[in-house]
Amino acid sequence: ENNMNTYTYIHEFGHVLGSDDYYDTANKNSPLSGCDIMDYMIGDHNAYTKFNYGWLSTSRLVVAEESVTLTLEDFSKNGDSIIIANNWDDALGAYQEYYILTYYRNTGLNGGEFGYFQNDGVVMYHINASLYKEEQDGEVYYDVYNNNTDGSDQYGTLDNLIEFVETSEGNIVYTAGTS
């Protein structure tokens, strides 16, 4: 019996589009707690992944020193998200350090038993997609530090590419409700 489902195809096609697995194959770290299609093959692609693919046309950038009041629409409907950054560089796009806020709904690919959370709410991600430069045999390569799938931490950074933001009590920043 073949246990493949739509989520498996979405996950594997994510690799075709350039995404790494977000789970730690050494099982030492769970930065997304299994709550992503590229992590535990549940739900949809998260805001960082869609931003990296160029699929987020409705993202709004907020410079960290600003004080603003914003409204978030359902991320699963239109990709609405808020990017919060200190020193944003347009030339780097997704490949820098920042936060992303989304309004999560338990619908669509996130619906039912395959959803991240049972209730609707705001989710905050910390992204560290900073690039590093490597030279080998006269060729220059750029890559993203990613400890999510590297148990040996070959880059020596101990940084996760993407992770839920945690409170001082160790809980993820997730607020159920609409306000």
Annotated model-derived regions:
Residues V68-S179:
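Non-catalytic C-terminal accessory/binding modules of secreted extracellular proteins
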Residues E1-G115, S130:
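Extracellular hydrolytic enzyme modules, especially secreted metalloproteases
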